[in-house]
């Protein structure tokens, strides 16, 4: 575990940059004007999973695409499924925001942006945790699957 924690410490700036890049995508699923942004968020997620050595693909749905990724290189071990969503709610009313909703801002040690907690932050924390484990150890103690919609 020490190697994983050291890896996380060494990569904090990159993790923040990746998080902020995802937060800048205005993937508002309830607004048809943002359909392309939802696709962009799905493609961003697929690319991230692939960069970790996972097999990933986008599945088309009647609504917005979902992303499925897997790392199945731990034969005989359990499989962990992580679920999350890249879409966000509309940021209205805009006048209640202290900073632009799709421009991440750090105040008092917290990140403020639409989706920072629900749910881009949550699912990306899982993704980056798995990435840290894989990069620090070369493998994982379980098979891993992600379903992000």
Where are the regions a protein language model picked out?
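Acidic/His- and Gly-rich active-site-bordering loop/insert found
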Residues: 2-116, 123, 133-142
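Histidine/acidic-residue-rich, glycine-tolerant segments that coordinate divalent metal ions
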Residues: 141-149
């Amino acid at each position: 575990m020490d190697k994983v924690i050291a890896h996380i410490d060494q990569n904090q700036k990159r993790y923040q940059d990746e998080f902020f890049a995802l937060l800048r995508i205005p993937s508002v699923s309830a607004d048809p004007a943002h359909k392309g942004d939802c696709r962009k968020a799905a493609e961003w997620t697929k690319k991230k999973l692939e960069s970790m050595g996972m097999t990933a693909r986008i599945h088309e749905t009647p609504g917005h695409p979902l992303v499925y990724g897997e790392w199945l290189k731990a034969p005989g071990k359990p499989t962990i499924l992580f679920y999350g969503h890249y879409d966000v709610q509309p940021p209205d009313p805009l006048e209640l925001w202290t900073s632009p909703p799709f421009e991440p801002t750090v105040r008092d040690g917290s990140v403020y942006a639409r989706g920072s907690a629900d749910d881009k932050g949550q699912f990306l924390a899982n993704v980056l945790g798995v990435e840290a484990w894989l990069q620090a150890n070369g493998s994982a103690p379980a098979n891993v699957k992600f379903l992000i919609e």
